[in-house]
Amino acid sequence: MAQTPPPESAPSTDSEPETALETARRQLQAAAEHVDIADGVIERLTHPTRVVQVSVPVERDDGTVTVYDGYRAQHDDVRGPYKGGLRYHPGVSAEECVGLSMWMTWKCAVMDLPFGGAKGGVVVDPKTLSADEHERLTRRFAAELRDEVGPSQDIPAPDMGTDAQTMAWFMDAYSMQQGETVPGVVTGKPPVAGGSHGRAEAPGRSVAIATREAINYYDIPIDDATVAVQGYGSVGANAALLLDDWGARVVAVSDVNGGVLDTDGLDTHAIPSHGNQPAAVMRHDAPNTLTNEELLELDVDVVIPAAVGNVITAANADRIQADIVVEGANGPTTSAADRILEERAVPVIPDILANAGGVTVSYFEWLQDINRRTWSPERVRDELESEMLSAWNAVRSEVDDGDLSWRDAAYVVALQRIGRAKEARGLWP
């Protein structure tokens, strides 16, 4: 198992799009200006603790063998074990994993969870794998990462191209090597295999909670609020359903194929998520259709980019008409776009706060696994609501007291907590 040196991004310009690592480092430096924290701590947080690279040989169904590259970036563990997703995607790279692991560190800290950040994955298009090949890939990847992961060391979770079944296979492969069942090695498992109720809906639920609180903060009655959601997968669909149930008017939703628009409000319960029915959005009977780009520029109270990164850029930030942007995806707004939106006084509720429901309920799952005690769905929802409101109030206080953007305020909360932990622990040796 090789450990690759931390990747070094070339100095970034304002050209679009940025890599996840460039964006994460820019955001760190911007927030550091507002925090009384040692320069040495910021320098340490600019780099990961380690990046592990492994080769993952897999026997294909036809008997041939394909070797895939796998990565695990572990950013910082001063507050607890590393935590972050595993993705199967052709675009996985060491640099991407480092950038995403940094976001996980901030996300865990802003939620005050006892974890640090990690991210990993395999360079593969999961659509090219049969179910059996997917399982063999996962089990071999788990075997290669055995020394790097564990309930007190590094706890993976689902991400792009992986799901609850992937996590069950990973947990089983790890457990077979350990000689005992270790459900806490991963989160996002099926409830029958040590998973938690409410995990799948958690990121969307937290986005909905953040949207509700933002609407309230800016004195918009929720019954009058109009919402557009780009990305109707698990995050976007669950957020839209909840906001619809709470009284907001969801006027547009989209998936990779395009979107639908009804200014009177869509019946979100009549539109299956992209994961359940990939073509359902465009088949929905609505007065108008639109592109993903057009959805982002609708004149609504809230736009929720919940699909992929780098969709709000310097090229379209001037055309965003929403009063509030709530980030459902990871990194949907580039740094250049952030500056433009801030100049235009368009608040952006950042991803590290808005979509933190996934890692928060992963924490609940980890607690349930460690204690061998299952929580009810109602308890999971109530605990998530409580954790989200606590984090929201901490960030809101920084916004109000420090005259900061929501992103800078969230980073300030995270960096203060990480800085205090590093100061208390010191630097060894």
Swiss-Prot record:
Q: Which GO terms describe its biological process?
A: glutamate catabolic process
Instruction: Enumerate the residue ranges of region (Disordered).
Output: 1-20
What keywords sit in the KW lines?
Oxidoreductase
> Any idea of its EC number?
1.4.1.-
Gene3D superfamilies, alphabetized:
Leucine Dehydrogenase, chain A, domain 1, NAD(P)-binding Rossmann-like Domain
Broad enzyme group: oxidoreductase
The family database entries (SMART domains) matched by this protein are listed as: ELFV_dehydrog (SM00839)
Which InterPro entries does this UniProt record tie to the protein?
A: Aminoacid_DH-like_N_sf (IPR046346), Glu/Leu/Phe/Val/Trp_DH (IPR006095), Glu/Leu/Phe/Val/Trp_DH_C (IPR006096), Glu/Leu/Phe/Val/Trp_DH_dimer (IPR006097), Glu/Leu/Phe/Val_DH_AS (IPR033524), Glu_DH (IPR014362), GluDhGdhB (IPR054867), NAD(P)-bd_dom_sf (IPR036291)
Active site at: 119
Q: How does it assemble?
A: Homohexamer.
Recite the other comments: Strain NRC-36014 contains 4 distinct glutamate dehydrogenases while strain NRC-1 contains only 3.
Give the family per the record.
Answer: Belongs to the Glu/Leu/Phe/Val dehydrogenases family.
Protein name (Swiss-Prot/TrEMBL): Glutamate dehydrogenase B
